[in-house]
């Protein structure tokens, strides 16, 4: 299950995490964001990646800091740094490829 993060919890939940973290930048009014959410849950489960969500309407500063111009935007963080990103609701395999996760066994 995804964890909602705010500017106050982002450093602890994402930047200081020991494992890779997939950050889903989304909004309540965004249909494609809701459509891709279960796909992201599966990717996180299959690849042992922590999944967190940032509501861009509530956390505009975070969205600006990471250059989020459209949603959904998913950014994979490794060792506290953005490692890969994908924009838009895409099929599971395309998201995995874009994030460099490969195919789960």
Predicted region positions:
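A short beta-strand-turn-helix
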Residues: 3-21, 60-61
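Thiol-based oxidoreductase modules, predominantly thioredoxin-like and allied folds used
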Residues: 5-6, 25, 37-61, 68
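Conserved hydrophobic/aromatic "anchor" residues
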Residues: 10, 25-26, 66, 77
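Short pre-active-site segment immediately N-terminal to redox-active cysteine/selenocysteine motifs
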Residues: 18-19, 25-29, 70
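Structural signature of beta-strand start/N-cap positions in the alpha/beta core
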Residues: 19, 48-50, 72
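The canonical Cys-X-X-Cys-His
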Residues: 30-33, 74
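Non-catalytic, surface beta->alpha helical segment in thiol-disulfide oxidoreductase systems
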Residues: 75-105
């Amino acid at each position: 299950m995804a964890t909602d993060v705010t500017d106050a919890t982002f450093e602890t939940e994402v930047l200081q995490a020991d494992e890779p973290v997939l950050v889903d930048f989304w909004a309540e009014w965004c249909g494609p964001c809701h459509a891709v959410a279960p796909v992201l849950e599966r990717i996180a489960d299959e690849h042992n990646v922590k999944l967190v969500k940032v509501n861009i309407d509530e956390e505009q500063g975070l969205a600006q800091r990471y250059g989020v111009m459209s949603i959904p935007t998913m950014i994979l963080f490794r060792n506290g740094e953005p490692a890969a990103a994908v924009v838009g609701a895409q099929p599971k395999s395309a998201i995995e490829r874009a994030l460099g996760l490969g195919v789960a066994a």
